[in-house]
């Protein structure tokens, strides 16, 4: 195997190893996300994109070269012509065909696994972000549930307080209404007494007024009689 195909085979083995490591079930995507978030990857991001495209181009070139070699050595005309000139040519051609097919598989799978590896890294990163987002949403949902539970408990407590307060308020209102009814009855009684007293006072005033009028009339009569008596007494003295 030449140096270039040895490098491609090593690259293929490395790809298989990385894919197997990425597929290990006990390493969570968040751990890979932390590894991918190292600052060193940010520094080589531009070089990494260029290297990725360069490796794809090289693998495509090697794959096409391997396809050309396979087509070259798998031609029936070439095999028959070589076999006629030299007895060992058939075995030599078959060996080259085997190497060409091996190189074809190595380059083809290297190209395929390289694309798979890039896609796998992207999917792991997206999965880690989704899991992180899911964790945040779960935490928010738990907080919302706790807050809702707290609000429900507070609401129940307020309902109980309002219920108790309503009962106490009802008792207070009943007591106040009872007291107001008693005060009302007392005021009615006092008002009736005052009305009776006023009526009696008015009657007394009327009686006193009538008595005063009679006394005035009697007094006027007595004055007239007194005047008449004085006049008579004066006339009697003059006659004597």
From Swiss-Prot:
Intervals, Cytoplasmic compartment: 28-43, 125-240
Short name of any one Pfam family annotated for the protein: Bap31_Bap29_C
PANTHER family assigned: B-CELL RECEPTOR-ASSOCIATED PROTEIN 29, BCR-ASSOCIATED PROTEIN, BAP
Chain ranges for the short sequence motif Di-lysine motif as given in the UniProt record: 237-240
GO annotation terms (biological process): apoptotic process; endoplasmic reticulum to Golgi vesicle-mediated transport; intracellular protein transport; protein localization to endoplasmic reticulum exit site
Gene name per UniProt: BCAP29
Annotated localization: Endoplasmic reticulum membrane
Assigned protein family: Belongs to the BCAP29/BCAP31 family.
Bilayer-crossing regions: 7-27, 44-64, 104-124
Coiled coil: 166-233
Assembly: Homodimer and heterodimer with BCAP31. Binds CASP8 as a complex containing BCAP31, BCAP29, BCL2 and/or BCL2L1. Interacts with VAMP3, VAMP1 and membrane IgD immunoglobulins. May interact with ACTG1 and non-muscle myosin II.
Protein topology in the membrane: Multi-pass membrane protein
Keywords noted in UniProt: Apoptosis, Coiled coil, Endoplasmic reticulum, ER-Golgi transport, Membrane, Protein transport, Transmembrane, Transmembrane helix, Transport
Organism: Bos taurus (Bovine)
Topological domains, Lumenal: 1-6, 65-103
Name the UniProt record assigns to this protein: B-cell receptor-associated protein 29
Matching Gene3D superfamilies: 1.20.5.110
Role according to the record: May play a role in anterograde transport of membrane proteins from the endoplasmic reticulum to the Golgi. May be involved in CASP8-mediated apoptosis.
A GO CC term attached to the entry: endoplasmic reticulum membrane
């Amino acid at each position: 195997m030449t140096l270039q195909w040895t490098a491609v085979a090593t690259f293929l083995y490395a790809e298989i190893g990385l894919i197997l490591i990425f597929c290990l079930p006990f390493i969570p995507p968040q751990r890979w996300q932390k590894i991918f978030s190292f600052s060193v990857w940010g520094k080589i991001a531009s070089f990494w994109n260029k290297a990725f495209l360069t490796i794809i181009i090289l693998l495509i070139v090697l794959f096409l070269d391997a396809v050309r070699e396979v087509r070259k050595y798998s031609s029936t005309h070439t095999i028959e012509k070589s076999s006629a000139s030299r007895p060992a040519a058939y075995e030599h051609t078959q060996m080259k065909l085997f190497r060409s097919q091996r190189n074809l598989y190595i380059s083809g799978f290297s190209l395929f696994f390289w694309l798979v590896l890039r896609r796998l890294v992207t999917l792991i990163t997206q999965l880690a972000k989704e899991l992180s987002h899911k964790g945040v949403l779960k935490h928010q949902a738990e907080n919302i549930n706790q807050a809702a539970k707290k609000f429900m408990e507070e609401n129940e407590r307020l309902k109980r307080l309002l219920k108790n307060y309503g009962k106490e308020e009802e008792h207070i209102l009943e007591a106040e209404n009872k007291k107001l009814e008693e005060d009302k009855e007392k005021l009615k009684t006092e008002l009736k007494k005052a009305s009776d007293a006023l009526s009696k006072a008015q009657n007394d005033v009327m009686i006193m007024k009538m008595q005063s009028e009679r006394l005035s009339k009697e007094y006027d009569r007595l004055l007239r009689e007194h005047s008449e008596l004085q006049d008579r007494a004066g006339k009697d003295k003059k006659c004597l």
